[in-house]
From Swiss-Prot:
Name of protein: Zinc finger A20 and AN1 domain-containing stress-associated protein 12
Organism from which the protein derives: Oryza sativa subsp. japonica
Stored Gene3D superfamilies: 1.20.5.4770, 4.10.240.30, AN1-like Zinc finger
Keywords: Metal-binding, Repeat, Stress response, Zinc, Zinc-finger
Gene responsible for this protein: SAP12
Function in brief: May be involved in environmental stress response.
Ranges of Low complexity composition bias in the record: 112-139
Length: 224
């Protein structure tokens, strides 16, 4: 339709340089389509015989031959072990598998066996020193004697504890009161004002208060 409209427009315009289709269909042709219109040129291409696919067949034949040759080479390389163990051998190992070839080298080559023997010998000769077990030191007889002497002295000191009042010499026994000045007194003379006490209670209290309430002083501010 577009070509017919173009032809009508050309005819109405008084003619042009475009030539008619060589098949005489009434449409215009061009040099690019061998003086045919687009429809006739497309039909001509469809009617033309296709070229035989010779090249793909040749490529397929070459690939098949190459795969056959590779398979044959692989079959030659994967020959069975000459020792008859059932595994595959190779030309590099005298047509033997790796295990049979290694056993063959061990049996025939003294260097191979001697190179492996020092390694085993060195591993077997290594000895690990074991540290002797440490035992806990037992207390000596001298220590026991010292402990017994200390216990005896403490019991003697307890037995020698005075059981009489220092002021009136009254026997107090275990009910005596010990003053901080070091003496033992009865219930009558147990207070500091009832006997000549030499202990400074005020000083002791001041030291105790100072110890329990330390003076906290903030550090001085350094001016720059």
């Amino acid at each position: 339709m577009e070509e017919q409209q173009a032809a009508a427009a050309g005819g109405g315009g008084g003619g042009g340089g475009a030539s008619m289709c060589a098949n005489g269909c009434g449409f215009f042709g061009s040099e690019a389509t061998k003086k045919l219109c687009s429809k006739c040129y497309r039909d001509q291409l469809k009617a033309a015989p296709s070229s035989p696919p010779a090249a793909p067949d040749l490529v397929a034949n070459e690939e098949e031959e190459a795969s056959t040759a590779a398979a044959a080479a692989a079959d030659e390389q994967l020959a069975l072990c000459s020792s008859g163990c059932g595994f595959f051998g190779s030309k590099e190992t005298n047509n033997m598998c790796s295990k049979c070839y290694r056993d063959h080298l061990k049996a025939t080559s003294p260097l191979f066996s001697s190179s492996s023997s020092p390694a085993t010998a060195s591993t077997t000769d290594i000895t690990v020193p074991i540290a002797p077990a440490t035992t806990a030191p037992t207390p000596s007889l001298k220590g026991k004697e010292e402990e017994a002497t200390a216990a005896a002295s403490s019991s003697a000191a307890a037995a020698a504890k005075p059981n009489r009042c220092v002021a009136c010499r009254k026997k107090v026994g275990l009910l005596g009161f010990e003053c901080r000045c070091g003496g033992t007194f009865c219930s009558t003379h147990r207070h500091a004002d009832k006997h000549a006490c030499t202990f400074d209670f005020k000083k002791s209290d001041r030291e105790k208060i100072a110890k329990e309430n330390p003076l906290i002083v903030a550090p001085k501010i350094t001016k720059f």
